[in-house]
């Protein structure tokens, strides 16, 4: 473990670089020994290996706008509060799938849009990472389901109206 940087009253304060024994590294601002302000945290060996978080910290946790890049190719750009994804943000998977919308406590929650590389798209409400509330799922061939969702599933049975554009709507099941 090694720290190179500024100290004040025996604490890390100001600019500095801390390297941990597992190869992790934080480069940025410190206040009273905690990550505070602008900085880049690169994780070392282990579960979070090679993940990188860039931007703002408060009390040692990601806060404000930030970017985190995961070793599996996923990337999140957006708001953090107390170390969790909170507010507006975009998560892009390595396969090109993308979510743009609201986050709460690290989960997709609120209004958002999820798109797939094949052209499929869900637009609507999310809760705890799942479709929940009013939403529209559009398939790449133009078919649509418009209706209510609960825990990632359609809440009601479907009916479809066949026209040039097939539209399926939720209706009360029997």
Language-model regions, residue ranges each:
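Conserved anchor residues at repeat-unit boundaries in beta-strand-based tandem repeats, strongest
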Residues: 2-13, 25-36, 48-63, 75-86, ...
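Beta-turn initiation residues at beta-strand->coil junctions
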Residues: 18-22, 41-44, 68-71, 91-93, ...
């Amino acid at each position: 473990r090694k720290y190179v940087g500024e100290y004040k009253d025996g604490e890390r304060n100001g600019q500095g670089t801390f390297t941990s024994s597992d190869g992790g590294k934080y480069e940025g601002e410190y206040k009273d020994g905690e990550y505070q302000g602008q900085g880049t945290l690169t994780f070392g060996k282990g579960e979070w290996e090679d993940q990188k978080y860039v931007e703002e910290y408060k009390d040692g946790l990601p806060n404000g706008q930030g970017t985190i890049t995961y070793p599996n190719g996923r990337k999140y750009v957006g708001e953090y509060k107390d170390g969790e994804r909170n507010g507006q943000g975009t998560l892009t998977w390595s396969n090109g799938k993308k979510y743009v919308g609201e986050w709460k406590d690290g989960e997709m929650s609120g209004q958002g849009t999820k798109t797939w590389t094949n052209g499929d798209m869900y637009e609507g409400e999310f809760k705890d990472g799942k479709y929940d509330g009013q939403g529209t799922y559009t398939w790449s061939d133009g078919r649509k389901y418009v209706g209510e969702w609960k825990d990632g599933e359609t809440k009601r049975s479907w009916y479809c109206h066949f026209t040039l554009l097939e539209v399926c709507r939720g209706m009360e099941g029997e």
